Curated annotation (Swiss-Prot):
A Gene Ontology BP annotation from the UniProt entry: fatty acid metabolic process
Entry's Gene Ontology molecular function annotations: medium-chain fatty acid-CoA ligase activity
Coiled coil: none
Pfam families: AMP-binding
Class of this enzyme: ligase
Record-listed E.C. numbers: 6.2.1.-
Protein family according to the UniProt entry: Belongs to the ATP-dependent AMP-binding enzyme family.
The protein, known as: Putative long chain fatty acid-CoA ligase VraA
Organism: Staphylococcus epidermidis (strain ATCC 35984 / DSM 28319 / BCRC 17069 / CCUG 31568 / BM 3577 / RP62A)
Keyword RNA-binding recorded: no
Gene3D superfamilies per the UniProt record, alphabetical: 3.30.300.30, N-terminal domain of ligase-like (3.40.50.12780)
Top-level taxon of origin: Bacteria
Alphabetical keyword list: Fatty acid metabolism, Ligase, Lipid metabolism
Length: 453
């Protein structure tokens, strides 16, 4: 039996009447959750050891029940996004040899052949997740149980108010929300989720339960929470992952929730947690202090000690489906970074790097400076082709202010090289986002090039 099943069973036995799951219209105690899991597992008797099972119910509570029910049958849950098209689901099922699908409590057998049907499954896999993105087929990856149990322990160290409730209003198909849910149920806490993020109804629900609460969000959600201007004394910890929050956002959060600790995480679906920034105590523009026992390498460093970040820890995944990792292998994050006094500084994604006149330009470094300007909501630097320089940088931004190019150029030149200063500025109404709530860089770039912004 998986340890997460043992942990869950412990709290079912100890606290059967404690709330386990809260999703708007559905509330389940630990005892009720246990019965639902058992009944579901009886429906899925045909699932055999290590067979992959796609979870695609429209209601997240059903997917959580089925997640544990599949484990009781010895299968491997595959976390689908309920908004995916039938065509995408068919492609994923065929590509990754997903033998079964569950929707509306019905188990359906898949008859398609796959190139991975003879693959050796890594040890202690608890599910298969999928990378998010706006283009191409999501990549399937193995998440092993030990990596999350280690992550749970690191989380516990950072929660300082004996939080009894864990909130993650994002889709369970995203690693952050699913992680928060399994973490809550493995530690006897109440998990609150939402089918669709609604900050006002979320605040009302947290206030009604009136328990010490930790909330897992992405920066776009943080901004929406700020916009509600609703105080909630129950919120004791805010854990944000996906992008660095600005000083202005931190100050607004501190004003709205003075009792709460703000903990920013940097990590990836593959590597899990890499660094953390507790109440912005790390140096400006750093993404925080490296977690204990996270080893790092900077590959192909330049003269400024900037290199491609690779990490190794007990929290990393077990590889992509078809490309399983060797235990203890290094995970390349795709980020250019440097490290100073155990604090990690990101300068940009490898895929986002712009080469202006032969000089490497990293968008993240420019964006962080722009985000420090009062009145700026979001900033994005993209590279577009240029006959003379190869590429030039373009700044897209949203907010209440109208930036003046000469003033911005003067401001940036004090801290950046000439090649790093964007050649053009464009104010836009809003950004486009990926499924996980991050700015969709490629889509924004294409729309700018095509004159659609």
């Amino acid at each position: 039996m998986k340890k997460i099943m043992e942990y869950l069973q412990h709290y079912i036995n100890q606290y059967p009447h404690r709330l386990a799951l809260v999703f708007e219209d559905r509330h389940l105690t630990y005892g009720e959750l246990s019965k639902e899991i058992y009944q579901a597992s009886m429906r899925y008797k045909e699932v055999k050891l290590n067979e992959k099972v796609g979870l695609m119910d429209d209601h997240p509570v059903n997917n959580i029940i089925n997640y544990f029910a599949v484990h009781q049958r010895g299968g491997i849950p595959c976390i689908f996004n309920h908004q995916w098209s039938n065509e995408r689901i068919h492609q994923l099922v065929k590509s990754y040899d997903i033998q079964w699908l569950i929707k509306d409590n019905h188990l359906t057998l898949n008859h398609d052949d796959s190139i991975y049907n003879d693959e050796v499954i890594p040890r202690n896999v608890i599910h298969i997740g999928f990378t998010s993105g706006t283009t191409g087929l999501p990549k399937a990856f193995y998440r092993n149980e030990h990596s999350w149990i280690v992550s749970f322990k690191e989380n516990e160290k950072l929660l300082q108010h004996c939080e009894e409730t864990i909130v993650a209003p994002g889709p369970l198909s995203h690693s952050l929300s699913l992680y928060a849910c399994i973490y809550a149920l493995s530690t006897g806490k109440t998990f609150i989720g939402q089918k669709n993020f609604n900050p006002l109804s979320l605040m009302r629900l947290i206030n009604q339960l009136n328990k010490a609460t930790a909330i897992f969000v992405v920066p776009t959600m943080v901004q929406q929470l700020i916009s509600t201007q609703r105080h909630c004394s129950s919120i004791k910890s805010i854990l944000s992952s996906g992008a660095k929050l600005t000083l202005q956002q931190f100050q607004q959060i501190s004003t709205l929730y003075p009792q709460a600790n703000l903990i920013e995480f940097f990590g990836t679906s593959e590597a899990s947690f890499i660094s953390y920034n507790f109440n912005q105590s790390s140096p400006a523009h750093s993404v925080g202090k490296l977690f204990p026992h996270v080893e790092t390498r900077l590959l192909n460093q330049d003269d400024d000690a900037v290199g491609l970040l690779a990490v190794r820890s007990e929290m990393v995944f077990s590889g992509y489906v078809g490309q399983s990792n060797q235990e203890g292998s290094w995970i390349k994050t795709g980020d250019f970074a440097y490290i100073k006094n155990q604090h990690l500084f990101l300068v940009g994604r490898e895929s986002d790097r712009i080469i202006v006149g032969g000089i490497n330009v990293y968008p993240t470094a420019i964006e962080s400076l722009i985000m420090d300007i009062e009145g700026i909501d979001e900033a994005l630097v993209i590279g577009i082709p240029h006959a003379k320089f190869g590429e030039i940088a373009i700044l897209l931004y949203s907010g209440k202010v109208q930036l003046n190019y000469r003033q911005i150029k003067s401001f940036l030149m004090k801290q950046l090289s000439r090649q790093e200063v964007p050649s053009k500025l464009k104010k836009i109404d809003h950004m486009i986002y990926t499924e996980s709530g991050k700015i969709a860089r490629k889509e924004m770039k294409n729309k700018f090039i095509n004159g659609e912004l």
